[in-house]
């Protein structure tokens, strides 16, 4: 249907969208999607045996943190208005079953207590997986050996549940199972409830793809698999209907929130999830998404601030209530600057 009636100077244009784009104040008044620091989650990497900060080469501006540096980072986040973190650990030792993941004195458990000491109101989300703690780098324990080794789904569930309980006992508000083991949410919910942690929420990595965008993270967390890949348990990025089934399954098992990862390549799934459920939806703007923007900006090809904010708006516009992003602190500062204008 034409939006122009008539021709020439007397033409009547039915839609004058530019009327509401004339000034920054008008554009702000009618903006449909609004970012706020409270919806941003900063991922943090906690390094055992360290006190300071160790830059992550593949992720400019991000560091591995010792416990003292972690507490300092909490103060920086608070000042920026970022009130939620997602924790990953780098243990001092690894073994075949990833026992450091559920140790009472594990690095993430110690990190949770350190954060609680300086910021009791911080929302602490703890990742639940074994890949950073296993000597082989897979997200569950192995059955078989050599070329016949496979990840044992059901045996891994017990260890993931034990890890979630340990993290809850340390003080995590939310546990986030990311191993993509079938039935992990149900196993974790049952274990939390049995241990008296009925108020600990579950943010399920419901649709986690076997993505090429995870490369920088695996350097940051020292979690690359020693052999093979994770395609037998992480999802094929080509499968949208399967992602919706995974989301439905995690909700049926007791997830309080669901996460989709990576974010920008999966905006269709974020939108589909938003139409499908009323629970909070998180999207993870992963390391490769972050580092690609950093690299392009460092070469002068893109405006770091503009591209980062536009990407976050796109994720929110698709339907995400929560965005896990390495830009969290920077974005919070940019949003405050915009609000003062």
Spell out what each predicted region is.
Residues 3, 23, 39-41, 47-341:
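Alpha/beta enzyme core
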Residues 2-31:
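N-terminal amphipathic/basic leader segments beginning at the initiator methionine
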